[in-house]
């Protein structure tokens, strides 16, 4: 080939590169996310669904969620009612369009089926018609997924799935033929595309993301989320497959290794309120980066302290007040005598074993006050309240507070326990006086400002403000656990590095 021919080939290559979309040239696949503001209808639906979820979980027992070591326990708690960010995919050939949540906290892809005849929810959403796809392959294996505020059931099928410019071939997914209840009927999305690990996939189905990597569709085994928190609605952000967009973040990412496959789970350090330690996670907690959870969920003991500092409404726990009035001084004396904190509640006779467990059952009893809820000290509300009091008192003693001040403060916290329905209101005019809440990840503090963790609903005189924090107690061995949902991921650009098994955070641009 002559010099002239080589030059022409090079020129053609340059021109072709210039004509390619920027994302293709970068080896990135971009999915635009739409943002929907939280409205009053969604809030009402969330509360109703939350009540149903609490009743269902109460029958199983709060402690059973983590005790069995099952990988699907967090999925069983998920609440999609206040989801705000959605993207579009196609299923079949030609592609049938569906709006989905890209959810790093679950691993299956499901969409409503045209064979869904008896669930009203299906008729409010797009439905997959296998007969209209030339690449459909029958599977038929039954499937069901139970979420915290809803469930779906159906069967597996296989077809091509279009994500942006990519076509994932032979993808196993669930055709949902049953979507009972309120949750998915009022949802603004059709289905869910899970981006978690295969370990938590129902039916052991290979997740869409795995297939992208296996079929060589992405340049790097990495995907990243950017949520546009500056937009009330419309352009909500972007998910990038194959890497990250430098215009979406500032500075460098702080990476932490995935500590347990299944979820994008990692180890997290102390949580600080206004720069002061809460003590609860000083020796370490686990956390999950979860794009399918709108709020930021954590242990009741810390959420209660946050509620108190931001002036959030709460519920009064008589069990908590009883512990303070009848056992508070004794607990303080044992802490001052350097008794091992995990043994204190059993020593005062409120727990039947040494070691922490979840407190969800206790908080539920505050509202429901159902007979029999507190039977058995091991999982009773008095034991739960005692364990929280020990954590709170430890933290106050570390700040050299007097015993009277400590007991008064703990009594105040008993009035600020989070609602079991997960929503706490705050005064919109008080944001300037609210503290920063910081999370220690990879040795670095990631702070959330009030305007980042308070969600505004409505406009003008009708506007209401709700806390972006909600209580969720996961006992050992899975917990204590934080779920860093969209409230956190909106402030921090998040990278999910499948190749190096790590999660990275940097300030969003």
Curated annotation (Swiss-Prot):
Domain Peptidase A1, which positions? 85-506
Its family remark reads: Belongs to the peptidase A1 family.
Q: What is this protein called?
A: Aspartic proteinase oryzasin-1
One GO MF term attached to the UniProt entry: aspartic-type endopeptidase activity
Q: Which terms in the GO cellular component ontology are assigned?
A: vacuole
Where in the cell is the protein located?
Vacuole
Tell me, which GO biological process terms does this entry list?
lipid metabolic process; proteolysis
Q: Which residues form the Saposin B-type domain?
A: 315-420
Catalytic residues per the record?
Answer: 103, 290
- Glycosylation sites per record: 252, 400
Keyword list, A-Z: Aspartyl protease, Disulfide bond, Glycoprotein, Hydrolase, Protease, Signal, Vacuole, Zymogen
Q: What role is this protein assigned?
A: Involved in the breakdown of propeptides of storage proteins in protein-storage vacuoles.
> Which EC numbers does the record give?
3.4.23.-
Q: Which segments does the entry list as coiled coil?
A: none
Q: Which domain of life is it from?
A: Eukaryota
Propeptide spans which residues? 25-67
Cited CDD domains: phytepsin (cd06098)
Quick one: signal sequence residues?
Answer: 1-24
InterPro entries for this protein:
Aspartic_peptidase_A1, Aspartic_peptidase_AS, PEPTIDASE_A1, Peptidase_aspartic_dom_sf, Phytepsin, SapB_1, SapB_2, Saposin-like
Positions of disulphide bridges: 116-122, 281-285, 320-414, 345-386, 351-383, 428-465
Do you know which PROSITE patterns this protein is assigned to?
ASP_PROTEASE (PS00141), PEPTIDASE_A1 (PS51767), SAP_B (PS50015)
């Amino acid at each position: 080939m002559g010099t002239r021919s080589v030059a022409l080939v090079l020129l053609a290559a340059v021109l072709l590169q210039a004509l390619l979309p920027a994302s293709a040239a970068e080896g990135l696949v971009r999915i635009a996310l739409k943002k929907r503001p939280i409205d009053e209808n969604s809030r009402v639906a969330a509360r109703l669904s939350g009540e149903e979820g609490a009743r269902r979980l109460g029958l199983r027992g709060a402690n059973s969620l983590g005790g069995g070591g099952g990988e699907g326990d967090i999925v069983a708690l998920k609440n999609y009612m206040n989801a705000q960010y959605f993207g579009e995919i196609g299923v079949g050939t030609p592609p049938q369009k569906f709006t989905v949540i890209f959810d790093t906290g679950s691993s299956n892809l499901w969409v409503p089926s045209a064979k869904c005849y008896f669930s009203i929810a299906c008729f409010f959403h797009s439905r997959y018609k296998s007969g209209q796809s030339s690449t459909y392959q029958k599977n038929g294996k039954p499937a069901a997924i139970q979420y915290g505020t809803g469930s779906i059931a159906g069967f597996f099928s296989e077809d091509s799935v279009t994500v942006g410019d990519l076509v994932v071939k032979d993808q196993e997914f669930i055709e949902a033929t049953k979507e009972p209840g309120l949750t998915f009927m009022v949802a603004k999305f059709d289905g869910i595309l899970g981006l978690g690990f295969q370990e938590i996939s129902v039916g052991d189905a290979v997740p869409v993301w795995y297939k992208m990597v296996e079929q060589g569709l992405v340049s790097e085994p990495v995907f990243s989320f950017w949520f546009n928190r500056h937009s009330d609605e419309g352009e909500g952000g972007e998910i990038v497959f194959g890497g990250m967009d430098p215009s979406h973040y500032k500075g460098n990412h702080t990476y932490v290794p995935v500590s347990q496959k299944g979820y994008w789970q990692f180890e997290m350090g102390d949580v600080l309120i206004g720069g002061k330690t809460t003590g609860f996670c000083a020796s370490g907690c686990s956390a999950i980066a979860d794009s399918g959870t709108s709020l930021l969920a954590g242990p009741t003991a810390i959420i209660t302290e946050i509620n108190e500092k931001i002036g959030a409404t709460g519920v009064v726990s008589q069990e908590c007040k009883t512990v303070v009035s009848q056992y508070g001084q004794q607990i303080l004396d044992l802490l001052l005598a350097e008794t091992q904190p995990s043994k204190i509640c059993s020593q005062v006779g409120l727990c039947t074993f040494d070691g922490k467990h979840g407190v969800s059952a206790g908080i539920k009893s505050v509202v429901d006050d159902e007979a029999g809820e507190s039977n058995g000290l091991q999982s009773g509300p008095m034991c739960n309240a005692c364990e929280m009091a020990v954590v709170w008192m430890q933290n106050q003693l570390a700040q050299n507070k007097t015993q009277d001040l400590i007991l008064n403060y703990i009594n105040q916290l008993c009035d600020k326990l989070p609602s079991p329905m997960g929503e706490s209101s705050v005064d919109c005019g008080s944001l300037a006086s609210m503290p920063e809440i910081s999370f220690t990840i990879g040795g670095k503090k990631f702070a959330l400002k009030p305007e980042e963790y308070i969600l505004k609903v409505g406009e003008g005189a009708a506007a209401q403000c709700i806390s972006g924090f909600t209580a969720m107690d996961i006992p050992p061995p899975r917990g204590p656990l934080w779920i860093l949902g969209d409230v956190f991921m909106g402030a921090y650009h998040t990278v999910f590095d499948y190749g190096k098994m790590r999660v990275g955070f940097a300030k969003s641009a």
